[in-house]
Amino acid sequence: MIPVVALVGRPNVGKSTLFNRLTRTRDALVADFPGLTRDRKYGRAEVNGHEFIIIDTGGIDGTENGVETHMAEQSLMAIEEADIVLFLVDARDGLLPADEAIARHLRSRDKATFLVANKTDGIDAEVAVGDFYSLGMGEVHPIAASHGRGVTQLIEDALVPFIPQEAPAPVLSEEEENAAYWAELEAEADGEAQEEEEAFDPINQPIKIAIVGRPNVGKSTLTNRILGEDRVVVYDMPGTTRDSIYIPMERDEREYVLIDTAGVRKRGKVTDTVEKFSVIKTLQAIEDANVVLLVIDARQGISDQDLSLLGFILNSGRSLVVVVNKWDGLSLEVKEQVKDMLDLRLGFVDFARIHFISALHGSGVGNLFESIQEAYESATRRVSTAMLTRIMTMAQDDHQPPMVRGRRVKLKYAHAGGYNPPIVVIHGNQVKDLPDSYKRYLMNYFRRSLNVMGTPIRIQFKEGDNPFANKRNTLTPNQMRKRKRLLSHLKKTK
């Protein structure tokens, strides 16, 4: 499961600066979630290939009462949700009473905590951080969040328990190394890696479905309607420490796993109480799912919170089905207004199917599975290099790439770069200089040609590098001898 990192500390110690620097690595700021806690922000970040969710908390003031109230209201909640806590202090201000008060609270929590001294740029870091050792939080990690210095090393140190450790390579003799090298070349020649990829059969894998949305949009009702229709609730299988429930089920001889973030446990225990909503549970469920059902309340329309959640789904590359709930009872006029609003605000996800349902009465719920299967198959379909290159050539013939610096951009070939979501890698000259409009044209062309529905499709561009760039023309010994003889001959003829 993707780890969760919380940033805590006094106001103005650089928590938001560090948050913005980390989330910019994936350009995936999830923004504020109104209705939860005002001063907490959630983001998705990646450092050196290691992904994590990060929480930016509001500053904790220096009074003892203030520490208690603010910690209880927001920072304490963030700490409880987190796997790792980064406790930020200001190296320029030095140790303050508020830092000591926060440290006392953190020492009472059983969490992996890293003491981070920020704003060490332009000062002697070793001298500046000396006082902070008295907090009893172990090693002090000096960083400069505004410039990024020390940030990567800090995150790598913090994520060590969550990074799978590779077994150390055995020490081989020279003969064994040579044998291993040739064996590896043989394996590549035989295409073993390709056979392993082809052996993956998505049909035999259960489809993991996450049902997400704002509070009170009907996630619990929809979950129980799906389970009640199929009557195949086997058992509740705990998924994570954050109590997301993984419920295996079967429909039409196809296996699924419902990831329930709404707190529903068993049929018969459904209440009308307000659904519990945890941002962390939702974000982790999205990361772990194959297909995400985004539930929207038809009576409330699309809020900024829905769009924030939608942005996270797209950045995660997950397949998407939009579910507009509470459709029953609306007048024809209101239904038309809702559809117009969906066209206006969700135009950028035109690849996703939209279903209008009533989870309470069951209308339209059964049709969801057609779109779920369609989205999953689109996301996991294997496409050959020959097919992708042919589609790329057709797109290029229909609409030539624009001129860049007086030269026509040339697309050479395309191949698959990954699945779930589908990634197409295009090689060519000056491809990174293509305007966004042409990149969107290519993406839509591939989507139409491959009939991809329900999943985002990504296109990556790679330059056709000159293999002789930055290489000196070194002569062989034979060429050197010929050159010497030629120069000697030229001298004699002068």
Curated annotation (Swiss-Prot):
- Provide one Gene Ontology biological process annotation: ribosome biogenesis
**Keyword Transcription regulation on entry:** no
Q: Which residues bind GTP 1?
A: 9-16, 56-60, 118-121
> What keywords appear on the UniProt entry?
GTP-binding, Nucleotide-binding, Repeat, Ribosome biogenesis
Instruction: List the CDD domains hit by this protein, alphabetically.
Output: EngA1, EngA2
Cross-referenced InterPro entries, in alphabetical order? Answer: G_ENGA, GTP-bd, GTPase_Der, KH_dom-like, KH_dom-like_a/b, P-loop_NTPase, Small_GTP-bd
**Which positions are annotated as binding GTP 2?**
213-220, 260-264, 325-328
Q: Where is the KH-like domain?
A: 381-465
A single GO molecular function term of this UniProt record: ribosome binding
Boundaries of each EngA-type G domain copy? 3-166, 207-380
User: Has keyword Repeat?
Assistant: yes
Recorded hits in Pfam families, A to Z, give: KH_dom-like, MMR_HSR1
Q: Which family does it belong to?
A: Belongs to the TRAFAC class TrmE-Era-EngA-EngB-Septin-like GTPase superfamily. EngA (Der) GTPase family.
Q: How does it assemble?
A: Associates with the 50S ribosomal subunit.
**Its job:** GTPase that plays an essential role in the late steps of ribosome biogenesis.
Q: What is this protein called?
A: GTPase Der
Q: Which gene encodes it?
A: der
